[in-house]
Amino acid sequence: MKEWIIYRYGGGHWARNIRSTEHYFRPGLTWPRRTQGGLSLRAMPAGCIFADKGPAAFVLGDDSDELLALLALANSRSFGLLVSLQMAFGSYEVGVIQRTPVPSLTVTQRKELANLARRAWSLKRTADSVTETSHAFVLPAALRAPRDCDHSLALKVEIDEIHAAIDAIAFDLYGFAEADREAVNGPVMDDEEVETEEDDEDVEAEVPSTDGLLSWAVGVAFGCFDLRIATGERPLPPEPEPFDPLPTKAPGMLPDGAEPFHAHEAILVDEQGHPHDLVHLVEEVLGRVKAPVPDEVRRWLRKEFFAFHLKLYSKSRRKAPIYWPLATASGSYALWLYYPSLSSQTLYTAINDFIAPKL
């Protein structure tokens, strides 16, 4: 990376553009520097690198309880108000966060705030377990038990209660009078009052239940996701701690070395009757988990899936689809390539095993 920086910026020492490397890979807190969603600090696991648009804050000794207590305080209304007094809404520079006072905590206060933050983190992680692109992904929402729909509402209610408990503690720590508390708890600024600026944070749209289910089934067919999680044949790993290094794979993904649902050479095909027919495999996956098979899966795969997939796997200007379609102009015949398994032999296999026999 240092060599790339020197090349990219026309020589000179790499330290001109890579700063504070002694803090790389430490656990800490991070936040988007510019966002119209309001100040929102979150846990930054060990093993990460911060940057200009995603700065970081640390504590001496990297103590997890101290970090969690700071996380709770920094997301309180009191802290947010003190930040807003120093600069415009939507812009959260490092210097402003650094200058905002943090009250001294007793051991009891630190533990109480840390427990609240840890519980909120766990609830948020549970909510992310139905998001395919999350490192916490387990299963799509459509495969959760009916009671989980009520559970998701309960998660939101409990998170709101945790925010209220943190706010109450923070008000006391900062010495807010009752009248000041009522003012801080007043209505939030309307969207029309917020100036439009460049936003460093992407907001994920909710995925339709059926599309999410079909996308997961495609992933199982390609060997991306593990069918055994849905059937109960494989137990889930225990929940990590907030500052544990991120896993190389989400819990719902197929572990390295495990037998995939369908053996293939990184290529599946849209061709009825073919042993590697993607549509047949998707329908077989849904049958194994006793999920209803939607009508016109083949039409959905041809007309809608890639646009849906590309949007799901895009962030800002970076597009990173993992399933690549190679189709005829009419779209009546297509090969689907699985990017993580591509090799120097993939195109030869596509031509010799799939295309040549059709000529």
Predicted segments with their positions:
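Secondary-structure capping and boundary motifs in well-ordered enzyme cores
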Residues: 23, 46-49, 62, 66, ...
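Hydrophobic alpha-helix feature that most strongly marks membrane-spanning transmembrane helices
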Residues: 62, 75-79, 101-105, 118-121, ...
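Polyanion-binding catalytic cores of nucleic-acid enzymes and NTP/SAM-utilizing transferases
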Residues: 1-60, 114, 126, 148-152, ...
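Terminal accessory regions of large proteins
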Residues: 168, 179-359
